[in-house]
Swiss-Prot record:
Record protein name field: Aminopeptidase
GO MF annotations, alphabetized: aminopeptidase activity; metal ion binding; metalloexopeptidase activity
Annotated control of activity: Mature protein inhibited by dithiothreitol and Zn(2+) chelators such as 1,10-phenanthroline, EDTA and EGTA. Not inhibited by serine-protease inhibitors, N-ethylmaleimide or phosphoramidon (which inhibits elastase).
InterPro entries the record matches: M28_fam, M28_SGAP-like, PA_dom_sf, PA_domain, Peptidase_M28
Family recorded in the similarity comment: Belongs to the peptidase M28 family. M28A subfamily.
Residue ranges crossing the lipid bilayer per the database entry: none
Cysteine disulfide partners in this protein: 465-470
Catalysed reactions, semicolon-separated: Release of an N-terminal amino acid, Xaa-|-Yaa-, in which Xaa is preferably Leu, but may be other amino acids including Pro although not Arg or Lys, and Yaa may be Pro. Amino acid amides and methyl esters are also readily hydrolyzed, but rates on arylamides are exceedingly low
Organism name: Pseudomonas aeruginosa (strain ATCC 15692 / DSM 22644 / CIP 104116 / JCM 14847 / LMG 12228 / 1C / PRS 101 / PAO1)
SUPFAM superfamilies: PA domain, Zn-dependent exopeptidases
Localisation per UniProt entry: Secreted
Length: 536
């Protein structure tokens, strides 16, 4: 079979497979390996308006080696700015400038969207000790930690338990109602149990009752709710007092210690400021049928953020540059989100401030957050809910199938990843916009089965440098970066040519729109995580 016929066969087989409920790998997948081999782009096609005339052109032109050059630029920016690119820092501003200038040079009109947010950075570890009835010192990151977005403070006070419900299987509502603080002695430290409502509500109720500080301990209703976790009082917290998180066992012990007095110190910086999203779109394409692609540009304060999420940002930037002269049928809009690490602030602001008619124009949103993890897996957001139960908005299952089809065409295995609201698709989900995307893993541990699928080491984190100083260029797996950059390019190209697979799924769901809307509202009300941290 000729290469030309190979290509024609691939496109035909792929179109059929994507529309099917169950996808099978093309029978001649091995023959396509040569076509997909990295390092063989056709320069005349890569610089041509015909780049997206088929979904196969853009992935062929998007080379990981060029993405790595952009990652090196982001690492250089971090190196010149205290080792990070966190939102509202000079390193982030330099990252914004780099993306903006690169897009402008490619011919894009670029919008830099400011938005308010509360910057939060730990300056050092906290301290916690008992002074009465006897001295005890507790260990940082073993017995207690900060809730993200806590205020700073240095408090010594009596500890007062608030409406606790101890024991396995408990349904704690501790601190969720103002009435829980009846007769609460002002100036005390409120000891509150996790459960039911969000941490912000608990802390603000305590502050309103006159608490000088708050300790929220884990719920203890199940074995996985006893230790420390990444938790937050939220970017909108206005209680004005320090809040720390502790283990369930410590919380129980403190609640049963008469006349307990604790000294807690929280050493953080928290201030209201503003930062930016960067948005650009192709000059051509139907403006009423937009395919939106997004990746967060900011890092955490602790490191340069080259995998998280320089990888998604740099791959998206390289793709945008390649698409600058292309002729898509549908307009492609790119966004580099700010303050994702502070709680998806930039993407949430963007979606919530779109007029209803503008939201309707976004047919699909594609999210790329961490696509170069060193011990990677090929993870696709579970749009159809077949792996984790929660479905995306109508059209999301079709997007998942497109990604699955790509991996099968490449002879690669893949699997679903949970819709857990840890990245910037969250507000698109809440707005009922079809979404999909890729992820190669963060702090979770690779299983034996996954090691057999993808290689790497079982029992080891997908990214041991997640949210750490060592998240630099050396932390990038270039094989993962190549595969996932190509997958991003493939699905973006496909949808830029036609959103029929998404349209058909939305139309099919139309008769069930009311029940689907109620399901979406219920799902949104049950969200326990928003970004990196648990919110309740």
């Amino acid at each position: 079979m000729s290469n030309k016929n190979n290509l024609r066969y691939a496109l035909g087989a792929l179109a059929l497979s994507v529309s099917a409920a169950s996808l099978a790998a093309p029978s001649e997948a091995q023959q396509f390996t040569e076509f997909w081999t990295p390092g063989k782009p056709n320069p005349s096609i890569c610089k041509s308006p015909l780049l997206v005339s088929t979904p196969l052109g853009l992935p062929r032109c998007l080379q990981a080696s060029n993405v790595v050059k952009r990652l090196q630029k982001l690492e250089d920016i971090a190196s010149l700015n205290d080792g990070n690119r966190a939102a509202a820092t000079p390193g982030y501003q330099a990252s914004v400038d780099y993306v903006k200038q690169t897009l402008q040079k490619a011919g894009y009109k670029v919008s830099v969207q400011p938005f308010p947010f509360t910057a939060y950075y730990p300056k050092g570890p906290g301290s916690l000790s008992a002074t009465v009835p006897q001295p005890v010192t507790y260990e940082w990151e073993k017995d207690f930690t900060y809730l993200s977005q806590t205020e700073a403070g240095d408090v010594t006070a009596k500890v007062v338990p608030v409406d606790l419900s101890l024991g396995a299987g408990n349904t704690s509502t501790s601190g969720c109602e103002a009435e829980d603080f009846a007769n609460f002695p002002a100036g005390s430290i409120a000891l509150i149990q996790r459960g039911t409502c969000n941490f912000e509500q608990k802390a603000e109720n305590a502050a309103a009752a006159g608490a000088a500080g708050v300790i929220i301990f884990n719920q203890g209703n199940t074995d996985d709710r006893k230790g420390l976790e990444n938790v937050t009082v939220g970017e909108s917290y206005e209680g004005g007092i320090p809040v720390i998180f502790a283990t369930y066992d410590n919380g129980v012990a403190w609640s049963q210690t008469p006349d307990l007095q604790l000294h807690l110190v929280v050493d953080v910086v928290r201030k209201k400021t503003e930062t930016y999203n960067v948005v650009a779109e192709t000059r051509r394409g139907n403006p009423n049928n937009v395919v939106m692609v997004g990746a967060h540009l900011d890092s955490v304060f602790e490191g340069p953020g080259i995998n998280d999420n320089g990888s998604g940002s740099a791959a998206q930037l390289e793709m945008a540059v390649l698409l600058a002269k292309a002729l898509p049928v549908n307009k492609v809009r790119f966004a580099w989100w700010g303050a994702e690490e502070a709680g998806l602030v930039g993407s949430t602001h963007y979606v919530q401030n779109l007029a209803p008619e503008e939201k309707k124009k976004i047919k699909a949103y594609l999210n790329f957050d961490m696509i170069g993890s060193p011990n990677f897996g090929n993870f696709i957001y579970d749009g159809d809910g077949s792996d984790f139960g929660l479905q995306g908005p109508p059209g999301s299952a079709a997007i998942e199938r497109l990604f699955e089809a790509y991996f099968r065409l490449r002879g690669q295995q893949s699997e679903g990843t949970e819709i857990d609201f840890r990245s910037d698709y969250a507000e698109f989900f809440n707005s009922g916009i079809a979404f999909g995307g890729l992820f190669t893993g963060a702090e979770g541990l690779k299983t034996e089965e996954q090691a057999q699928k993808y290689g790497g080491t079982a029992g080891k984190a997908y990214d041991e440098c997640y949210h750490s100083k060592c998240d630099g260029i050396a932390n990038i797996n270039q094989d993962a970066l190549e595969i996932h950059s190509d997958a991003m390019a493939f699905v973006t190209s496909w949808l830029s040519l036609s959103t029929k697979v998404v349209d058909d799924e939305i139309a099919a769901a139309g008769q069930k729109a009311q029940s689907r809307s109620l399901q979406m509202q219920k799902s949104a009300s049950q969200i326990e995580r928003w970004g990196h941290d648990f919110i309740k």
